[in-house]
Amino acid sequence: MQWLSVCSLLVLLSVLSRSQAQNQICTIFTEAKEDGFKSLILVGLAQNLPDSTLGDLVPLIAEALAMGVKCCSDTPPEDCERDVADLFQSAVCSSETLVEKNDLKMCCEKTAAERTHCFVDHKAKIPRDLSLKAELPAADQCEDFKKDHKAFVGRFIFKFSKSNPMLPPHVVLAIAKGYGEVLTTCCGEAEAQTCFDTKKATFQHAVMKRVAELRSLCIVHKKYGDRVVKAKKLVQYSQKMPQASFQEMGGMVDKIVATVAPCCSGDMVTCMKERKTLVDEVCADESVLSRAAGLSACCKEDAVHRGSCVEAMKPDPKPDGLSEHYDIHADIAAVCQTFTKTPDVAMGKLVYEISVRHPESSQQVILRFAKEAEQALLQCCDMEDHAECVKTALAGSDIDKKITDETDYYKKMCAAEAAVSDDSFEKSMMVYYTRIMPQASFDQLHMVSETVHDVLHACCKDEQGHFVLPCAEEKLTDAIDATCDDYDPSSINPHIAHCCNQSYSMRRHCILAIQPDTEFTPPELDASSFHMGPELCTKDSKDLLLSGKKLLYGVVRHKTTITEDHLKTISTKYHTMKEKCCAAEDQAACFTEEAPKLVSESAELVKV
């Protein structure tokens, strides 16, 4: 029974507060209810034992459920009160089969903190796979789903948890819930496959977005530390809950930041403990709940889904009497007094006051202004005439204008995206990014151009444009964070390396300021650089787009300052060749003859 009690404790105690009494399995068993209880256990097991089968885990989960009942009895077993991490690791290490099957021998030779670190590190090395591969057509999935809904969702949780061992359990369960909702909707439709294909694509995008946000936060924490994470979260939640005071928001954000390090390290026991403490304390504050409608609604969710609800909630209405604009100069004496004694408190108050007034702003715009304001306060607050000094220092910096200018920029990008086909816009992004970093591989630039297109396509759907700025800049910044972390920026070029090492809020602006790289020495532009044959006659739009992007990549790398007119000429010649050869009786022979001509003509154009 020790192993089974550990299975329960692994995840169930992981959502408990240290300040609560012992034997809290009973509390969570009651809060999460039976299905939530079993789901949490399944996530914890699958993430830590990726080479075990679902069949290996099912009987353990069933007995762990029985253990949960026993922990609610009048005489709970002693294992209900033992340390969860040590229990879990000891139980795993005592099973030779589990150790061998999951390659944990090295970890089990360690003890205490070293063993915990080894288990976390072992989990971190498991390959991630965010795709939601459909092994069966919609009709078969629907049949299985209708036959046994719980078993179907359980299989999804198992597979997704194994493929994503670093995702917090509450995120995995939110994703599983969403996938179940897709099937619930589509399995009642006459055209289930069409419905499934459409909704699955949307759902997959939402999954990628959520995971990108989590990963970006971890990257920011690793590179910039708690201070920047706290600033980001202060903006985010002040925008969502403008009715909360600065003091209330500050306390909440401190607790949020405390969860980041353990959650990003893969230490899900501590992660979920901290998250549970955070959500319980926030949801117990009746004063805040009475003023924050969105938070109040989320706190009515079950224990498993409350945290995800809070992260996804929309901004509440602003409080009555809140001025439209925040004027730092109106109370500069008090600002400087606070800044001199506790600069972080003063900067936090500034960020809060701007954020509650501007839910339409991105975090980055507010943080860019805050950085300028901080420099002004550093320069001026010790001076006798600090008020005039701050006015002079911030003369060219207006937060409202910054928000308007950035919003207008993205609206123009949206107009450009709407004016052309999806393929044309993605190709234009390929050209733009190849100009500034021709050293990058095709795969890298293909991903970047695809990401920019996907971000704008999603964010530009806000017809009024009220929230296009936070949507687009947040997602593009997440993409920059991932790119700078995935690749060695110095291997691309010094300009990209410089931007990746800029302050968090300035990275995107820095990249936009990069000019075409004229120092890059390109490879020879010849027919061997491109493979253009009968495969271009496919009707698969993705393959055609890929081929067109490869041609543009090769040409622009050869001359990063090539004109748009010359690119249009090459593109026209490419389509003419494609139409001619796809209509030819012997397509291969036609491409063999025409493709080298196109490359040769393109080479001549880039010399101009």
UniProtKB/Swiss-Prot annotation:
Name the PROSITE patterns for this protein: ALBUMIN_1, ALBUMIN_2
Albumin domain location, by residue? 19-205, 206-398, 402-600
Sorted alphabetically, the keyword list is: Disulfide bond, Glycoprotein, Lipid-binding, Metal-binding, Repeat, Secreted, Signal
Q: Which cysteines are joined by disulfide bonds?
A: C26-C72, C71-C80, C93-C108, C107-C118, C142-C187, C186-C195, C218-C264, C263-C271, C283-C299, C298-C309, C336-C381, C380-C389, C414-C460, C459-C471, C484-C500, C499-C510, C537-C582, C581-C590
Q: Name one GO molecular function term.
A: metal ion binding
Of the GO CC terms on this record, one is:
blood microparticle
Propeptide part(s) removed at maturation, as residue ranges: 15-18
Q: Which SMART domains match?
A: ALBUMIN
Which family, according to UniProt?
Belongs to the ALB/AFP/VDB family.
What this protein is reported to do is described as:
Binds water, Ca(2+), Na(+), K(+), fatty acids, hormones, bilirubin and drugs. Its main function is the regulation of the colloidal osmotic pressure of blood.
Protein name per the record = Albumin 1
- Name the encoding gene, please: alb1
